[in-house]
Swiss-Prot record:
Gene3D superfamilies: P-loop containing nucleotide triphosphate hydrolases
GO biological process per UniProt: DNA replication
Family: Belongs to the IS21/IS1162 putative ATP-binding protein family.
Gene name of the record: istB
Superkingdom, taxonomy of origin: Bacteria
Signal sequence extent: none
Ranges that cross the membrane: none
Function as written in the Swiss-Prot or TrEMBL entry: One of two proteins expressed only when there is a tandem repeat of the IS21 insertion sequence, it is necessary for the transposition of plasmids with that tandem repeat.
Keywords carried by this UniProt record: ATP-binding, Nucleotide-binding, Plasmid, Transposable element
GO molecular function: ATP binding; ATP hydrolysis activity
Species assigned in the record: Pseudomonas aeruginosa
Cross-referenced InterPro entries: AAA+_ATPase, ClpA/B, DNAC/IstB-like, IstB, IstB_ATP-bd, P-loop_NTPase
Protein name: Insertion sequence IS21 putative ATP-binding protein
Binding site for ATP: G104, P105, P106, G107, V108, G109, K110, T111
């Protein structure tokens, strides 16, 4: 190993060490001066570290898949204010510890937008965690039963952005709703939540099994927040119609009906 590679390794500049020979060749061909070469070399190291950090944060985020805002079909959901989405993509809401609430029926793109904003936050260096509500509640209930609730709440507070998906698909009892409130209260004005729900705010009292508690939950969520109410057709139904599985006159069973009939998985 050459002395230069040894020094770079000692400085823990692994990416630069790996590419240094090719960078030296480029510098010679382009006749770069010392400052230009140094900038190019440091940029190479930064790019490598950024990519490695993003891959690590994406893994820790537990996203079910990676979606971007560039992949979102705004033409299919023209009711969404693109200006608001662009502002959210700037992540000022994260810096201000504000929340984003995405409402709408199943399949309109709520989770896609939530994940895309999460990916933006990961790219910016923030710690993100994605959890469907049922998994969150199960995690909190187990922690409470094992007398480690405070520690679990603290662990969930480490995420700069917490994405809570599928609020409203299944009702909660009062104990579960109370645990949910404790989490919101812990994060209030300290870290951001991105939340998706198929229920309008008027239905949250029934959903949480306690209208007073639902009011307190909404108070914490809405105090500093941006709400997008998405009204439109389901992307999934559109694809099924394109494939000929459904006709335009077909009325598919809704997720709420599936829950009531016991068919929801």
């Amino acid at each position: 190993m050459h002395e230069l590679e040894v020094l770079l390794s000692r400085l823990k500049m692994e990416h630069l060490s790996y590419h240094v020979e090719s960078l030296l060749e480029q510098a010679a061909k382009k006749e770069l001066n010392y400052r230009e070469f140094l900038c190019m070399a440091l940029q190479q190291e930064w790019n490598g570290r950024h990519q490695r950090g993003m891959e690590s944060r994406l893994k820790q985020a537990r996203l079910p898949w990676v979606k971007t805002l560039e992949q979102f079909d705004f033409t299919f959901q023209p009711g969404i204010d693109r200006k608001v989405v662009r502002e959210l993509a700037g992540l000022a809401f994260v810096e201000r510890s504000e929340n984003v609430i995405l409402l709408g029926p199943p399949g309109v793109g709520k989770t896609h937008l939530a994940i895309a904003l999460g990916v933006k936050a990961v790219d910016a260096g923030h710690r993100v965690l994605f959890m469907p509500l049922d998994r969150l509640i199960a995690t909190l209930m187990k922690a409470k039963q094992e007398n480690r609730l405070e520690r679990q709440l603290q662990q969930l507070s480490y995420a700069r952005v917490l994405i809570l998906d599928e609020i409203g698909y299944l009702p909660m009892n009062r104990e579960e709703a109370s645990l949910f409130f404790r989490l919101l209260n812990r994060r209030y004005e300290k870290a951001s939540i991105i939340l998706t729900s198929n229920k309008g705010f008027a239905d949250w009292g029934e959903m949480f099994g306690d209208h007073v508690l639902a009011t307190a939950i909404l108070d914490r969520l809405l105090h500093h927040s941006t709400t997008l109410n998405i009204k439109g057709e389901s992307y999934r139904l559109k694809e099924k119609r394109k494939a000929g599985v459904l006709t335009k006159n077909t009325t598919p069973i809704s997720d709420d009906e599936m829950v009531k009939s016991g068919q929801h998985q």
